[in-house]
Regions:
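Conserved N-terminal catalytic core of the sugar/cofactor nucleotidyltransferase
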Residues: 2-67, 151
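Short aromatic/hydrophobic "clamp" motif used to bind/position activated sugar donors
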Residues: 70-71
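Glycine-rich beta-alpha junction loops
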Residues: 24, 104-107, 176, 185
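Hydrophobic helical membrane-anchoring modules
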Residues: 178-201
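Conserved core of the sugar-phosphate nucleotidyltransferase
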Residues: 79-172, 201
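Short active-site oxyanion
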Residues: 15-18, 97, 177-178
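Acidic metal-phosphate-binding loop of nucleotide-sugar-dependent transferases
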Residues: 49, 75-79
Length: 201
């Protein structure tokens, strides 16, 4: 899964480098073919997603400019389409804030209570599923994450950190097959989508 996700970014002509955030004791990374790729770097993971992302950004700030764009992507999303990645970059490279790939909500949404009872039906107009990659300026995103963590708000995506500071990230519509593999049952679905995209050998 990691190799599939990495290939999309490592092979992209407009991406200068890729930072992989892993547990410092991860035993499998050294056997990954990308471990020796000169375009790929490694950073230590943290307690939560926001800490891990900030770890990579802090390392990147040593060698990149704060105004450089960064893309943050879930390694568990190997089905990202190249066309979606290209659209994200092209649509946002002149944007003052940045943004993220997202998909409009099409299902009926319910809000529940702790006992599992419906409290309300949520109007789905203008609701979006937040996907990755999410694209922001390096310095701005690092600062937003530092501020969120210092405030005890362990945001679950980068856009949320930017929103806390009053920014309004742009939503770039992507494809719904950019799924996140979180359960074993997701693997066959990811394989199906990759086959449909012609990316399974």
């Amino acid at each position: 899964v990691l190799e599939r996700s990495l290939s999309t970014f490592v092979d992209h002509p407009r991406i200068d480098g890729v930072w992989v955030v892993l547990d410092s004791a991860d035993p499998r990374w050294d056997s990954n073919p990308y471990a020796r790729n000169p375009k790929v770097y490694r950073a230590a993971g943290g307690a939560e997603r926001c800490h891990s992302v900030l770890s990579a950004l802090e390392a990147l700030l040593v060698q990149a400019h704060p105004q450089d764009w960064v893309l943050v992507h879930d390694a568990a999303r190997p089905c990202l389409r190249l066309e979606d990645l290209n659209r994200l970059i092209e649509e946002l490279e002149q944007d003052p804030v940045g943004g993220l790939l997202a998909v409009p909500v099409r299902d009926t949404m319910k809000r529940g209570d702790p006992s599992g009872r419906v409290v309300a039906t949520v109007e789905r107009a203008h609701l979006w599923h937040a996907y990755t990659p999410q694209m922001f300026r390096l310095g701005a995103l690092a600062g937003a994450l530092r501020e969120a963590i210092a405030g005890g708000d362990w945001v679950t995506d980068e856009a949320s950190a930017m929103e806390r500071l009053g920014h309004r990230p742009r939503l770039i519509e992507g494809h719904a097959d950019n799924i996140k593999i979180t359960r074993k049952a997701d693997l066959p679905l990811a394989q199906f989508f990759l086959a449909q995209q012609g990316r399974l050998e």
